[in-house]
Amino acid sequence: MKQVVYTASPNSRQIHVWSLNVEGGLSLLQTVDVPGEVQPMVINPDGKHLYVGIRPQFSIVTYAIGKNGSLEQKSIAPLPGSPTHISTDRAGRFLFSASYSFNNLSVHPIDDQGNVKAPIQIVENLQAPHSANIDRENRQLLVPCLKEDHIRIFNMDNQGYLVESHADAITTETGAGPRHMAFHPKKQAIYCINELDSTVDVLRKWEKYRIVQSVDSLPADFSSVRWSADIHMTPDGRHLYTSERSESLISHFRVSEEGYHLTLAGHYLTETQPRGFAIDHSGHFLIASGQKSDHISVSRIDKFSGELTQLARYPVGKSPMWVTILAL
């Protein structure tokens, strides 16, 4: 399986495009100059387009992905606020942009050529929405609102329009600060990393979503300010990882067979201030970006234990924040 890694560095306005080999080595394919400070990225499910959010002219840039993973800019669409997180629905028909600082969420159609267009809906008065996450059925959008300690739930119709389901909203612990989410690849379990108390909430849906476990991601003797960031799961659903920026840690959880119980298994030092990381499609490698180190690092994931072993580090642009991986 050929894989390509994209890293976004906002302070140098660059995307670095890498080829990932089966041993975990990276080879630089392309350096792309972006028309703005590039932050969140997402790949269309068709595998043919990469979308990136930029500032200070808040926009979504559409890139065509070539056969070897290289990028070519196609179009730019406006955003109603600074993009914190972007995602698509599972059919690749709509893009969602959550804006933490502008307290809104926008919905954008994606045309038949893969271009993101101007928003068809803007949901206002959300308190610090930090991500937008479509469910496995492609029917509901889960939006963690950090300053509310709520995960808001929106029903999506066939035209991409959202209607909030207030009765389905999830309430976290006071001061938790829900941020990013990961979905089990085979089960119905969903996991949310809370930025401010560094817990992971495990969600299960019966008639509505419930938190069935909340577990601390940090060592018992952790004394720094808690500042968690990202969360990802291996493709086999056996291991879950989170990142913490104050002490630059990756935390590892073992996941129960049914998916609803996490066991903290270890902590690993990584790049300084790991704002974003990703796991490759084979589940063999974890790639972390260091917002304060201007490097990314590749670590091997032990298939059985989930333990991480760092393999190599690579310089990128300034303040790398996002890592996205494509299987060609």
Swiss-Prot record:
<dbReference type="GO" id="GO:0009051">
    <property type="term" value="P:pentose-phosphate shunt, oxidative branch"/>
</dbReference>
<dbReference type="InterPro" id="IPR011045">
    <property type="entry name" value="N2O_reductase_N"/>
</dbReference>
<dbReference type="InterPro" id="IPR022528">
    <property type="entry name" value="6-phosphogluconolactonase_YbhE"/>
</dbReference>
<dbReference type="GO" id="GO:0006006">
    <property type="term" value="P:glucose metabolic process"/>
</dbReference>
<dbReference type="GO" id="GO:0017057">
    <property type="term" value="F:6-phosphogluconolactonase activity"/>
</dbReference>
<comment type="function">
    <text>Catalyzes the hydrolysis of 6-phosphogluconolactone to 6-phosphogluconate.</text>
</comment>
<comment type="similarity">
    <text>Belongs to the cycloisomerase 2 family.</text>
</comment>
<dbReference type="InterPro" id="IPR015943">
    <property type="entry name" value="WD40/YVTN_repeat-like_dom_sf"/>
</dbReference>
<keyword id="KW-0313">Glucose metabolism</keyword>
<keyword id="KW-0119">Carbohydrate metabolism</keyword>
<dbReference type="InterPro" id="IPR050282">
    <property type="entry name" value="Cycloisomerase_2"/>
</dbReference>
<protein>
    <recommendedName>
        <fullName>6-phosphogluconolactonase</fullName>
        <ecNumber>3.1.1.31</ecNumber>
    </recommendedName>
</protein>
<dbReference type="Pfam" id="PF10282">
    <property type="entry name" value="Lactonase"/>
</dbReference>
<dbReference type="InterPro" id="IPR019405">
    <property type="entry name" value="Lactonase_7-beta_prop"/>
</dbReference>
<keyword id="KW-0378">Hydrolase</keyword>
<dbReference type="GO" id="GO:0005829">
    <property type="term" value="C:cytosol"/>
</dbReference>
<comment type="pathway">
    <text>Carbohydrate degradation; pentose phosphate pathway; D-ribulose 5-phosphate from D-glucose 6-phosphate (oxidative stage): step 2/3.</text>
</comment>
